[in-house]
């Protein structure tokens, strides 16, 4: 019973780890496009079509 619980716990941890990697690749698209995540109040940059972690930031190429 204890072994079954440990296997289940390992499965849950692996599932969390893989979902976290998918989330990080989604937010690294800005860096791959040559941009950086900046606050929306910054001026003088062109906005790129990529997502940032914070909803108050956008992907910006200076």
Curated annotation (Swiss-Prot):
Signal peptide range in chain numbering: 1-20
GO biological process: cell chemotaxis; defense response to bacterium
Compartment list: Secreted
Ranges annotated as spanning the membrane: none
Disulfide bonds: 30-59, 37-52, 45-60
Lineage: superkingdom: Eukaryota
Coarse class of the protein's main subcellular location: secreted
Cellular component annotations (GO), alphabetically ordered: extracellular space
Molecular-function GO term, any one: chemoattractant activity
Keywords: Antibiotic, Antimicrobial, Defensin, Disulfide bond, Secreted, Signal
Physiological role: Has antibacterial activity.
Family recorded in the similarity comment: Belongs to the beta-defensin family.
The name this protein goes by in its record: Beta-defensin 33
Organism: Rattus norvegicus
Phylogenetic lineage: Eukaryota, Metazoa, Chordata, Craniata, Vertebrata
Gene: Defb33
């Amino acid at each position: 019973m204890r072994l079954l619980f440990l296997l289940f716990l390992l499965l849950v941890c692996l599932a969390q780890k893989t979902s976290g990697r998918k989330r990080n690749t989604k937010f690294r698209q800005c860096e791959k496009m040559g941009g950086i995540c900046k606050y929306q109040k910054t001026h003088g940059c062109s906005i790129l079509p990529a997502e940032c972690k914070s909803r108050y930031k956008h992907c910006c190429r200076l």
